[in-house]
Each structure stands twice: as structure tokens, then as C-alpha cells.
Swiss-Prot record:
Record region (Disordered): 1-35
Function of the molecule: Maintains chromatin CpG methylation that plays a role in genomic imprinting, regulation of embryogenesis and seed viability. Required for proper patterns of CG DNA methylation in dividing cells. Required during the endosperm development in seeds.
Keywords: Chromatin regulator, DNA-binding, Isopeptide bond, Methyltransferase, Nucleus, Repeat, S-adenosyl-L-methionine, Transferase, Ubl conjugation
The encoding gene: MET3
Active site per the UniProt annotation: C1085
Entries under PANTHER family matching the protein: CYTOSINE-SPECIFIC METHYLTRANSFERASE (PTHR10629), DNA (CYTOSINE-5)-METHYLTRANSFERASE 1 (PTHR10629:SF52)
Name of the protein described by the UniProt record: DNA (cytosine-5)-methyltransferase 3
UniProt keyword NAD present: no
Residue ranges, compositional bias (Basic residues): 1-10
Length: 1404
């Protein structure tokens, strides 16, 4: 009880409560009938004043309460009710104690806030009393659960923040209870969780700086001063005001909350339970078989300001039950947030919905924390979920009926019911053949069907007679009507500033089609979403629709975090080492069998041991427990066992990681383990047991598919049977998981479980430690650093920042000018190695390196850089003394006569030439004198020799290693576009694109023009896959039966019909399994692109599903190599599930898989273009490495989140240096002739390479106003709409317009719309190439640096790295689309070179 401000509190209601009541009568006060001044009950107040308005009469009855003429000094206040679980607030005067119940309206807000503080105290007390060893996270979750549903809080996240913010208050209240506690009871004051809560509260108050009022912490008093009542009155009042401010912020947070679903109707018709009981099992209780965890413990509480932004997670093995543990149906819960819901009954489920695409249907439910996609229910709950699925299938059947009807208005409610009666019994939507039974089922389950149809984007379906008729029938059946909560509108000042408001999405003629898949792909993705299995595929919804056409675009992020130091490549690691829990139990441990040999330390090796009666073998798997409570036990593969010199029996093993702990996450098979390179040595006595474990090895090839499918089916059935019998899991391992390399690799079987004392992981670690050392040899003429040997005379790279003169200030950064000022590596030659007697301060080595600097043309001037070759360097007499850590690698400097005269391919070799001398003292540049002795690099690779001029004097181009077409990989390019990916791969000398599939006619024509020997199929890839399967079925049925392909293709009726229409000649040219070596392509990425406004549309969702078709091609043909390209956000789209399932699918096929993110601008193009890639290679092939980025480019380094705090970066960021400078706008387009806005003349004069005519140097025509704006934009770097003069102009039609765009002038919330109507900088880079350039579009910086026009098609093509000889097809819009959708050929070339290296390694 708190007697004075600052003193400890006591229990006010205890076993002596009756005595206290006799001593001091307690009365209930009611402040509802008199006006009072604003009251604040806090530690500051000791008296309460009330305005005297009414006097207590003698005839007032005590039980009705009294109204006071005056109210004396308040001595103290108290919180009681801890035993009852409901707080009671008391205030005391000298005369009596008062139970505070209903406050006045004016005081209600303040009192409610204080009452919630008291509730939090009671709930924390209750939870700690029953479970004092709980964790802070579990305590917060329990309190949030108990306090959820109160009107003052908008979500669980707000409750959690409130409880934490009141941590010190709660601690003080509960610590006061210790005075009356018994000796055997746990003291609150020492409770570690309560102390942690208090400490968290202090951290929040310390950081509470976003309000106008802040307490001066220098004046906070000590606890002794508080006990003496010495706290300053103003300080108390300041604390109170700060708390009020916090309360108001919670109020604002609550008011901003908006519903996710806009209600098309005013009412939600609730299902009548009695009507649907017939379709469900008999009532039963939920049986808990496994430990359950509160979602608030697993995930951080969120505010749910907009439920559309909630994360989406997947639930498996789930059940739905009420507070009485009775199983209930989802139909009892509303599909919309409603006002009349019994929140206590419904618990945390706010709403549920049905989401459907062209392939699958999902059932989702929402809590405050997340959306949950419902996977397979528990075995007990499955009968309760089946009616929901059946109703959904009926809904899809009705939707198909409506869409197939020419005029929906003709199809009445009765007509639909009659058609449902006429369905076959084997139809998934079959109910009965009796009209009465069908109508009853449709009406009583009508809310699901009604919601399913009204969510359809087709307005005709929403208003069709069946929908209105069904709603009417449901109301006539006396279902309950709930009022739907209205969607709260966010405050919007002024006019709508959305640039795309009022602009309807453009309509494409493309039709959506359900993906054609193989059964393996259908099973993997179907099991994850757990609605339809391979044996029960989703029925076709389909009818033709018009869909939104969207762009693949990725805008440069101006707010990316700037790194200040150079970071390492590969993986950012979390602390993954876990302490193994030892065993104190005595057990018998002995070796079995003979000694197999000795370790390198002379310790005897054994192949088998008995530990507590359990046999352990080399090559088996064991379980180890960790000290962290709640952590899953670890599984280790036994490499060898030995007895140490101190007679301890030990084993050395490698970690076998569960799939869920890898990048696969929830997409992994729970039985599959992955070998890793994490190893340890542990005593046998600490082993907790063994597991059933198999190293799974299978032959590779399409011809083994039937055998593997049958084996997998039996394996899954056996696993389900063991799971049902609660038997231990039987694990298997097929791959090595290496997060450091970002992939899954074939197992090193020749090095595994030999029992010889050798561990490949230990060897890798030793090599890495050796590489990290810097050593000087005895002769002091060479040294080793990062695994590279350097000698006197070598040409090397040096990090730019080590030279003081290169640390100049960069120009101001503007959009697409972020590369300006970035420096490439400095080329140097080692002259001498200087031995130091002792390391200098700040150096870690005892020697330094003397180097000669070679200058680059860009060190002289920008003009010199543009006019010179990017591989040219200048000799100088400048020398420097550098520490060895400044050296970044080796390069070569050659004579100019040994270099090619011109290049067609991007630079992938560290080679330079020098024939000029630069004097840095006066900036003079001259021919290199013959008397200067320069030892050039020796030519080791014949391909780098300069091609001799022919008799006509024309120069030949540098060509990569020529590989005969017959020895190249026979390639199928899917989603081929105009052929950028195929072009680069072919130029690398590794690929021969024999087949290509492209849906759009103009892009397909462009592909044919540039790849005349390729067979191009202009059709939907789903149809082509179906045809390939049919062709083999008709011509080689025996082969298909042998390979298990007879029923392997799952496709829609539409795809099957279109497959029959393909020309027979083209059908005969389709490849067969075994003929395709390499599949490459970039599935449509509209649904993944983060700047796609319409990514939730039907067309975009369908395009996302093309991943399934693409993977099915790989499964059907089983090529040696597979390459997937997509936008960067592919790895994070849909919470990463799509990316995880893609990798899981390839692993299930037996492939090795590697993934990474690359910046195309670092490979020789003049634009930022971040792309995700997934390589897959057959188990007996070598996975390609990622190509080294060669050009400076300002990017932060892109990392893929793995698991357990790990992040993987495929390559190192080049913002701090690279072998070559970035490619500028001037490099890319500076030599093109000037043209006018709207230029349409296709052919121009001779340009680059051996071209005699320049094509496609044409640009879009702007309207009159935009052309005027373009002319008014200054021709200076970074100029955009903000530089326009504020004036009006008369247009030719007589209309007067303001030159400054009105919307942009008011758009303060969009970073000023930087770059719109922007002019490019000669020294910067071009914007990301998109399919539709507009000055007011998503990428608005599209004006030529010197000319008043939008950049041309050819200029865009050059920014992508296409040569001038490359042709495009169609109109100007088609050509822009082809360029914008293409993979940059230089990046494809770099990937192809690495694939070529992998093939070379495979053949060694």
C-alpha cells in the first residue's frame, strides 16, 4: 500500500479485510452527477478539489451513493484485487477509504489510462505467481493475451509497448507486495523477469524524445530522496505530462488503424449454426499432442496499422477450437471484421478469407500479428475443414459457370442450382441430384460462396442475378446480420497527389493461363499451400479475361545506406557456435572392433563404439543437446572416432543442418538434413543418442524419373505411417549446404566417413587461416597476402584511398549521378620490398611495398577518359611506399601492339596497355620515350594476342576461345524476349540456342532476326510443354512408360486445345528429353517488381505462376544446367516463399543449386540493374562461380537473407574500387548523331564496329507541353522539374498551362519527386531501362543531356549493352519493351564465361 508519494506499497485487501472495513468504512464514490474540475490522480497530488454545486441531503440513501459538498485531503492511493485478478483502485482520506468505480465523463480518459496500468500490474502478478521462471517474452505474450480486446488499445503491439513502458511502475507496485508476503513465497523484488521489465522500461523512457516535452535527467532524484518525499513537484508534474503525451500517441496510433477489407455490402450475414450442423462431425474436444507456443512469443507484436502490410505465414497441422476446447468450424467466424462480434469467444482471429489465383486456392485467417495461410490441418481437425474446401470447390464451379455464360444476366439463381444438380457424382463440386438438397447446401453455406464471388474483380459477377438471389435467400432463412465495420478513411489534405490517379491500367491482349506443370512441381508447391495435391489438381477456373499490363522496373534507391568501410564478400555471420551440454550421468563406454589407424597426433582410431548400450558407427549420425533452453538438439555426422592422450573417448563430426534452418525455411522437407562444413570434437559421454540416417545417392537422368517417383512415393508413405505411430523420424541427406558460398552442392562422398582421422572441413579452415596471413619470404623479394603471391616487378592493384591525392571531395550526389567521383583501383608496379625492423604504428606487418604508379586517363580529365581506351594506363615517375594490405590483387600491363584494336565483348581480364608518359607535376602527357625501360607482362594466353590486320587494313575483333557449335550446350531459352540472354551466352562460347519460346510476336521476330538458326516458338510456354509431352506420348509411348512420363503432365483444357493447333512441322522440331543440355530464361517478373503498382492484379499473379511452368520444363527435360534470372525482389517476394520453393524444387529434382544477386552496372553497362540469379547443375557437373564485377558502381552490396542471422553476398560491392571505372552516359551514347523529338527514321549513317548502317536511333514524340518543359530544363547535371521557371505558356490549342507540373509542386511526401522531367549527366549513368519511358513516369530522368528529347531506342539498347548490329522489331513501343525486358548481354556474357570455366573443370 502506497501511503505517500514515492514510498512502497502494501496489499490493501488481504485476509484481514473484514477487520479493516470495521476500522475504516469504505464507500463507493460516484462522480457522474456533479461537475468537477479536471482531476489527475498521480503521485503529485495529495488533495482533490471539487466545485461545490450540490449539498448532500439527509434523505439520500447510502446504497445509492452520496454527492459531496467538499472532499478532504487525499492521503494516499492503493491498488488491490491481486488475488481476485481484477484491479480495484482506492483513495484514502483521514476519514475513510474510497473504492473508485465510475469516473465522470471529463475524467474518464485519464482514469481509464491509470486503470489499464493497474490491470497490467494485476496480470503481471498473476502470471509471475503461477510461473515465476517464465521468460520476459512469454510474460509479455501472456499479458497481451489477457488484456487484448480493450477499447483503449488498437492491437497487441500497442499493449506490449504499453506494458513495457510501465515496467518501472509495475515493478514498484509488485515489489511493495513483498512486505506482506510469507517467507516461503517468491519475492517480486528479486524476480529476474520483473527486473528485466523494469530495465526495458527505463530504456524506453530514456529514448522517448519524439515529443515536445522531455525531462531533464540530471535532476532525477535518488530512491532515498524519493523515500524522504524530496522529489521536486515540477519534476513530478513533468513526468505526468510526459505520460499523458505517451497516452495521446497511443490514441493517435489507434485512430490511424484501418480495416483491410472494404465492405461491398452494409451487412455481413452470419451463418446459422443449426443449419450447417448436419454437414459437420459430432462435437468433440481438441486434444493437444504437442507443445504449443503463443504467436506473440514467436514473433514480435505489431501495430497492424494496415492489415494489408501484415506478414503472411503458413500453418501446418493446425486446429481451430474455442475457449472451451471444443472444435469449431471456420464458418462460425466472420469473413469480415464486424462490430457485433463476441471478442472473448473468438479469441485472436479477426477475419478469414479465400484467396484464389489461376492455379491454387488459399484459405487465410488474420490475427493482430499476421495473416496465416492454412496448410494441412491436423488429423483430428481434417473432417471439420473438409466442408469448407467442398464449399470453396462449389464456389469455383459456380464462378466458372458464370464466366462461361455469354450474358450472366440470363443465368438466374434457379438456373445455377439446376446446373449444380446436373453434375456428375465424381465431380468435386457435386452435392446431390435433388434440387432441395443442393439449394439447402448453397444457402446455409452461402456466406462463403457469396464472399468468394463478391471479391471477384469482375463487376458483372458482383451484380449478377445469382449473387443477388443468393443474398436474398440467405436473409429469408433468418440468418443473423452483423454490421460490417466501415473502412476508416485516412486524413487527406488537399487534392490527391498520386501521379497515377485516374489512370486505368493499360489493357493487354495477353490471356492468363493456368501453369502447365509436372507432377513433381505440382506436389511440392501443392504440399506447401496444402489445398490441392497431385492426385487432386485444382479445377480450371478459367475463362478469358483482360489483364493489366505492367512494367518490370527497379528504381535507383536514393536512400540506400552508405557504407564507410569496405566489407567482406560472402556471408555476414551471426554467432552460430552453440555450447554442447555435457553429461553427468555415468554410463558404460567401450570401443568395438580393432584399431583402424592413428590420427596425425598418434591417437588410435576406431570404427565403432558402445555408449550406454547404444552402438555408434563412423558414418552414422548422433544427437547432441545444447545449453540454450528451448533449442532444438543438434545432429552431427560422425567422421571418425578416436581415443585422446588423456584416455578420453571422442568423436569428430560435421553438423547436419535441418532444412528449416537453411535458406529453405518452411519449404524444406522435415526429414532432409544437409551436411555442412561446421565441425567439432566431442566426448562420447556427451552424446544423447543416435538417429536413423541415410546418405541418399541416386543415378541422374531423365530416364530414371519413373524409378525415382515410385521410390519417393513409397518413402513418403512410410514416413507418414511412422509419424502416425509416433515413431522416430528417419532422416536422409543428399546435399552439402554452404551458406558461405550461397548454395547446395553435391556431397563429397569420397571424403565422408572414412574414419581415417581426416576432415575436409578442418582442411578448409586451415587453408582459410593460411590465406589470411601475410608473409615475406626469406629473400625479401616476394610476399604472400590473401593467398596471392607477389614479387618485385609484378603489376598490382592498389586501393584508391591509400593515396592522399585521390581523397578529393566528390561532386554533389544527384539521381543517376552517384557514380561520379568513384575511383577505380590504381595500377602500380612493385619496385621493391622494404623490410622494417619493427611494424609501424597502425601496421600489422614488418615490411612495406615500394610501387610505381600508373595513371589512368580519368586521372587526367573527363575528356581524356572519354577519348581514350578504358584499358589504357600512363607510365609515371611517381613512387609510393604502401603497407601490403593496400595491395588488392594482380594485373597485367602490355604493349599496345599486343592488344586488340577494338572490342565487342565486355572486359573480363585484368589487362592494360601503356605507350604514353604522364608527368603529374605539370599535367603533361607525351609519348613514352624509348629510353624508359618498362618491363611489360609476358603474354601467356594466345587469345589475348592482337589480331593482325588483313590486306585491306580492316581490324579484326577480339574473340573469345572458339568452341565448335557441336560441342556447345544445346540450349532452350524460355521467355526469350528479343534474345539478350541467349546472345551473351552464345558470345561466351558456351551455348548454342537451338530452341526459344516467346509469347509476344514482335519480341519473337526480333529473336529470329538476331538468331536465324534458332527454332522460335511464338506461343505460351504452357502450351509448348503440353505439346512436348504429347509428342513423346504419341511417338515414343514405350519410352514414356519406361521413364514414367505417361501421366506426368498436368495442364488445363485450354492448353490442351491450343496444343492441337500447333503446326505439325513445328511440333516435329520440339526437343525430347535428353536432347536439351541447358535451360535458361527469366520468367515474367511483374508480380515481383517492387515498383509495380498492379502487382496484386490477376495478370501479375498469373505471371508469378510462370515460375511453376519454368521449373516444370527443367523437371521434364532434366538438362545438365539451368539458369533463372529475375528482379532483385524475387528473393523477398511473398515473404521469400516463392524463392524458397524454387530452390526446394530444384533440390528435389537432384540438382546442385546456387543463388545470388548481381548488379549489371558492375559488368560494363551504364545503368543500375539489380538482378537475382539461380544456377542449377546436375550432381555430376560443376556449379559455375559468380563472375567478378569489373567496373566501379555505387551499390551497397546486395545480400540474401538465409537463416539464423546469416546473409549471403554473391560478390563484393565495387563502390570502393574495381579494376575499371564505371561506364558513363557519354561512353554509351556520346558518339550518336543528334535527332529531333519524335524522330522515326530508322536507318542512319555508319556507326560502331563493322556496322554500315545504324538502326533504331528513334525516339518517342512528346506532347506540346512536355516538349516545352523539356526545352526549359537546364542542360546541367541533375536538372529536373524543380528547375523549371514558374510561368505560364499558351499552347497551340489556345489553352494556357503552367510549365511547372502542379502535382509535383505539392508532392512533399515523395522526396520531391527527384528526377522527374530530369536531364541526364554525361558523367553519370543512365536510368534503369524500362519498357515505357515517360518524363512523368516511374523513371522520369529520360531527357538527353544536350538535346531536347527523350532518349532513343538505340540509346536504351546501348545502355543495356546491345551492339549496334542488334535488331529490334515492331513499332517504337514494342522496341522499347524488348530492350527494357532484356537481360543485358554483357552480364549474360560474364555468366557464360563462368559456365565455360565450370565445364572446363568438369572435363579435367
Amino acid at each position: 500500500m502506497k501511503t505517500k508519494a514515492g514510498k512502497q506499497k502494501k496489499r490493501s485487501v488481504d485476509s484481514d479485510d473484514d477487520v479493516s472495513r470495521e476500522r475504516r468504512p469504505k464507500r463507493a464514490t460516484s462522480g457522474t452527477n456533479f461537475k468537477e474540475k479536471s482531476l489527475r490522480f498521480s503521485e503529485k497530488y495529495e488533495t482533490v478539489e471539487a466545485k461545490k454545486e450540490q449539498i448532500v441531503g439527509d434523505d439520500e440513501k447510502e446504497e445509492k451513493g452520496v454527492r459531496f459538498q467538499s472532499f478532504g485531503r487525499v492521503e494516499n492511493w492503493t491498488i488491490s484485487g491481486y488475488e481476485d485478478g481484477s484491479p480495484v483502485i482506492w483513495i484514502s482520506t483521514v476519514i475513510a477509504d474510497y473504492d473508485c468505480r465510475k469516473p465522470s465523463k471529463k475524467y474518464k480518459k485519464l482514469y481509464d489510462y491509470f486503470f489499464e496500468k493497474a490491470c497490467a500490474c494485476v496480470e503481471v502478478c498473476k502470471n509471475l505467481s503461477t510461473n515465476p521462471d517464465t521468460s520476459l517474452k512469454e510474460l509479455l505474450a501472456a499479458v497481451v493475451r489477457s488484456m487484448n480486446g480493450r477499447k483503449i488499445f488498437s492491437s497487441g503491439g500497442v499493449i506490449q509497448e504499453f506494458v513495457i513502458s510501465q515496467g518501472e511502475f509495475i515493478y514498484n507496485q509488485l515489489a511493495g507486495l513483498d512486505e506482506t508476503s510469507k517467507n516461503h513465497e517468491t519475492k517480486f523484488v528479486d524476480n529476474r523477469v520483473l527486473v528485466s521489465l523494469r530495465d526495458e522500461s527505463r530504456k524506453i523512457h530514456k529514448a522517448f524524445s519524439n515529443v515536445a516535452l522531455r525531462i531533464d535527467e540530471s535532476k532525477v532524484l535518488t530512491s532515498d530522496q524519493l523515500m524522504d518525499g524530496g522529489e521536486d513537484e515540477d519534476l513530478k508534474y513533468a513526468k505526468l505530462l510526459q505520460e499523458e503525451e505517451h497516452m495521446k500517441s497511443m490514441d493517435r496510433s489507434r485512430n490511424k488503424r484501418s480495416s483491410t477489407t472494404s465492405a461491398p455490402n452494409k451487412f455481413y450475414i452470419k451463418i446459422n449454426e443449426d443449419e450447417i450442423a448436419h454437414d459437420y462431425p459430432l462435437p468433440s474436444y481438441y486434444k493437444n499432442t504437442k507443445d504449443e507456443t503463443d504467436e506473440l512469443v514467436l514473433f514480435n507484436a505489431g501495430y497492424a496499422v494496415d492489415a494489408r502490410n501484415l506478414p503472411c505465414r503458413t500453418l501446418h497441422n493446425w486446429a481451430l477450437y474455442n475457449s472451451d476446447l471444443m472444435l469449431i468450424s471456420l464458418e462460425f467466424l466472420p469473413m469480415k471484421p464486424c462490430a457485433d462480434i463476441d471478442v472473448t469467444y473468438l479469441g485472436q482471429i479477426k477475419e478469414w478469407k479465400i484467396d484464389f489465383g489461376e492455379d491454387m486456392i488459399f484459405v487465410l485467417l488474420r490475427t493482430d500479428m499476421a495473416w496465416y495461410r492454412l496448410g494441412k490441418p491436423s488429423e483430428q481437425y481434417a473432417p471439420w475443414f473438409e466442408p469448407i474446401l467442398k464449399t470453396v470447390r462449389i464456389g469455383t464451379s459456380i464462378l466458372a459457370l458464370l464466366k462461361n455464360e455469354t450474358r450472366m444476366a440470363k443465368l438466374s439463381y434457379t438456373d445455377v442450382i439446376k446446373r449444380l444438380c446436373g453434375l456428375e457424382e465424381n465431380d468435386q463440386a457435386y452435392i446431390s441430384s435433388t434440387f432441395f438438397d443442393v439449394e439447402r447446401y448453397v444457402i446455409v453455406h452461402g456466406q462463403i460462396i457469396l464472399q468468394f464471388l463478391t471479391e471477384c474483380p469482375d463487376e458483372y459477377i458482383k451484380r449478377c442475378p445469382f449473387v443477388t438471389g443468393l443474398a436474398s435467400k440467405m436473409q429469408d432463412r433468418h440468418h443473423t446480420k452483423w454490421i460490417i465495420k466501415k473502412k476508416r478513411k485516412m486524413l487527406q489534405k488537399g487534392e490527391n497527389l498520386n501521379l497515377r490517379r485516374g489512370k486505368a491500367p493499360k489493357v493487354s491482349k495477353m490471356k492468363a493461363m493456368q501453369a502447365t506443370t509436372t507432377r513433381l512441381i505440382n506436389r511440392i508447391w501443392g504440399e506447401f499451400y496444402s489445398i490441392y495435391s497431385p492426385e487432386d489438381p485444382l479445377e480450371e477456373i478459367g475463362a478469358e479475361e483482360e489483364f493489366e499490363e505492367v512494367e518490370d522496373v527497379e528504381e535507383e534507391d536514393e536512400n540506400e545506406e552508405e557504407d564507410t568501410i569496405q566489407k567482406a564478400i560472402e556471408v555476414q555471420k551471426a554467432d552460430t557456435l552453440k555450447k554442447i551440454r555435457g553429461s553427468c550421468k555415468e554410463m558404460e563406454i567401450r570401443w568395438e572392433g580393432e584399431i583402424l589407424g592413428e590420427t596425425c597426433a598418434g591417437e588410435p582410431l576406431y570404427g565403432q563404439a558402445l555408449v550406454g548400450g547404444r552402438k555408434m558407427d563412423v558414418g552414422g549420425a548422433v544427437i547432441l543437446e545444447v545449453d540454450d533452453q528451448g533449442e532444438t538438439p543438434l545432429i552431427y555426422f560422425v567422421e571418425y572416432m578416436f581415443e585422446s592422450s588423456d584416455n578420453s573417448k571422442k568423436l569428430h563430426g560435421k553438423l547436419l543442418q535441418r532444412g528449416s534452418e537453411t535458406v529453405l525455411g518452411t519449404a524444406a522437407n522435415e526429414r532432409e538434413l544437409f551436411l555442412t562444413n561446421e565441425c567439432l570434437t566431442v566426448q562420447l559421454k556427451d552424446i544423447k543418442g543416435t538417429v536413423s540416417f541415410e546418405i541418399r545417392s541416386r543415378p541422374w537422368g531423365h530416364q530414371y524419373k519413373k524409378e525415382h517417383m515410385a521410390a519417393d512415393k513409397l518413402d513418403r508413405a512410410r514416413a507418414e505411417e511412422r509419424k502416425a505411430k509416433d515413431l522416430p523420424i528417419e532422416y536422409y541427406c543428399k546435399s552439402l549446404y554452404s551458406p558461405e558460398k550461397g548454395g547446395f552442392f553435391s556431397l563429397p562422398r569420397s571424403d565422408m566417413g572414412l574414419g581415417s582421422g581426416f576432415c575436409s572441413s578442418c582442411k578448409i579452415r586451415e587453408n582459410e587461416e593460411e590465406r589470411s596471413k601475410t608473409k615475406l619470404n626469406d629473400s625479401k623479394t616476394r610476399f604472400l597476402s590473401n593467398g596471392i603471391k607477389y614479387s618485385v616487378g609484378d603489376f598490382v592493384y592498389q586501393i584508391p584511398n591509400y593515396l592522399s591525392k585521390d581523397r578529393g571531395k566528390r561532386r554533389p550526389v544527384f539521381k543517376y549521378g552517384r557514380n561520379v567521383g568513384l575511383r577505380a583501383f590504381v595500377v602500380c608496379q612493385i619496385l621493391d620490398i622494404v623490410d622494417l625492423k619493427e611494424p609501424k604504428k597502425g601496421n600489422t606487418t614488418s615490411f612495406e611495398v615500394k610501387v610505381r604508379r600508373f595513371y589512368r586517363p580519368d586521372d587526367v580529365s573527363a575528356e581524356e577518359a572519354y577519348a581514350s581506351d578504358i584499358q589504357e594506363v600512363y607510365y609515371s615517375e611517381d613512387t609510393y611506399i604502401l603497407p601490403p594490405e593496400a595491395i588488392k590483387g594482380k594485373c597485367e600491363v602490355m604493349k599496345k601492339t599486343d592488344m586488340p584494336l577494338c572490342r565487342e565483348y565486355p572486359i573480363l581480364d585484368h589487362v592494360y596497355f601503356c605507350d604514353r608518359f604522364y608527368d603529374s607535376s605539370n599535367g603533361c602527357l607525351k609519348k613514352l620515350p624509348y629510353n624508359m625501360m618498362l618491363k611489360f607482362s609476358t603474354i601467356k594466353d594466345d587469345t589475348l594476342l592482337r589480331e593482325k590486320k588483313t590486306e585491306t587494313g580492316s581490324a579484326m575483333l577480339l574473340k573469345p576461345d572458339e568452341v565448335p557449335k557441336g560441342k556447345r550446350l544445346a540450349t532452350l531459352d524460355i521467355f526469350a524476349g528479343c534474345g539478350g540472354l541467349s546472345y551473351g551466352l552464345e558470345k561466351a562460347g558456351v551455348s548454342d540456342t537451338k530452341w526459344a519460346i516467346e509469347y509476344e510476336e514482335p519480341a519473337a521476330q526480333a529473336f529470329k532476326q538476331n538468331h536465324p538458326k534458332t527454332t522460335v516458338f511464338v506461343d505460351n510456354c504452357n502450351v509448348i510443354l503440353r505439346i512436348s509431352w504429347l509428342r513423346l506420348l504419341i511417338n515414343d509411348r514405350a519410352i514414356m512408360e519406361k521413364c514414367g512420363d505417361v501421366d506426368d503432365c498436368i495442364s488445363t483444357t485450354e492448353a490442351a486445345e491450343l496444343a492441337t493447333k500447333l503446326d505439325e512441322n513445328q511440333k516435329s522440331t520440339l526437343p525430347l528429353p535428353g536432347q536439351v543440355d541447358f535451360i535458361s530464361g527469366g520468367p515474367p517478373c511483374q508480380g515481383f517488381s517492387r515498383l509495380n503498382r498492379f502487382s496484386d492484379g490477376s495478370w501479375s499473379k498469373n505471371q508469378c505462376q510462370m515460375i511453376l511452368a519454368f521449373l516444370s520444363f527443367a523437371d521434364y527435360f532434366r538438362p545438365k544446367y539451368f539458369l533463372l534470372e529475375n528482379v532483385k525482389t524475387f528473393v523477398s517476394f511473398n515473404e521469400g516463399h516463392t524463392f524458397h520453393l524454387t530452390v526446394a524444387s530444384l533440390l528435389e529434382m537432384g540438382y546442385q543449386v546456387r543463388f545470388g544477386l548481381l548488379e549489371a552496372g558492375a559488368y560494363g553497362i551504364s545503368q543500375p540493374r539489380k538482378r537475382a540469379f539461380i544456377w542449377a547443375a546436375a550432381p555430376n557437373e560443376v556449379l559455375p562461380e559468380w563472375p567478378e564485377p569489373m567496373h566501379v558502381f555505387n551499390n551497397p552490396g546486395f545480400k540474401i537473407p538465409l537463416s539464423q542471422g546469416l546473409h549471403y553476398a554473391a560478390v563484393q560491392s565495387t563502390k570502393f574500387g574495381a579494376p575499371f571505372r564505371s561506364i558513363t552516359v557519354r561512353d554509351a551514347i556520346g558518339d550518336l548523331p543528334p535527332i529531333e523529338s519524335g524522330e522515326s527514321k530508322i536507318n542512319k549513317e555508319e556507326m560502331r564496329g563493322s556496322m554500315t548502317v545504324l538502326t533504331d536511333h528513334i525516339c518517342k514524340k512528346m506532347n506540346e507541353l512536355n516538349l516545352i518543359r523539356c526545352k526549359k530544363i537546364p542542360k546541367t547535371p541533375g536538372a529536373d522539374w524543380r528547375d523549371l521557371p514558374d510561368e505560364h505558356v499558351n499552347l497551340s490549342n489556345g489553352i494556357v498551362k503552367n510549365i511547372v507540373p502542379n502535382l509535383l509542386n505539392k508532392a512533399k511526401d515523395h522526396n520531391g519527386y527527384k528526377g522527374l522531367y530530369g536531364r541526364l549527366d554525361w558523367h553519370g549513368n543512365l536510368p534503369t531501362c524500362i519498357t515505357n519511358l515517360q518524363p512523368m513516369g516511374l523513371v522520369g530522368m529520360c531527357f538527353h543531356p544536350d538535346q531536347d528529347r527523350i532518349i532513343s531506342v538505340r540509346e536504351c539498347a546501348r545502355s543495356q549493352g546491345f551492339p549496334d548490329s542488334y535488331k529490334f522489331s515492331g513499332n517504337i513501343k514494342d522496341k522499347h519493351r524488348q530492350v527494357g525486358n532484356a537481360v543485358p548481354p554483357p552480364l549474360a556474357f560474364a555468366l557464360g564465361r563462368k559456365l565455360k570455366e565450370a565445364l572446363h573443370l568438369r572435363n579435367i
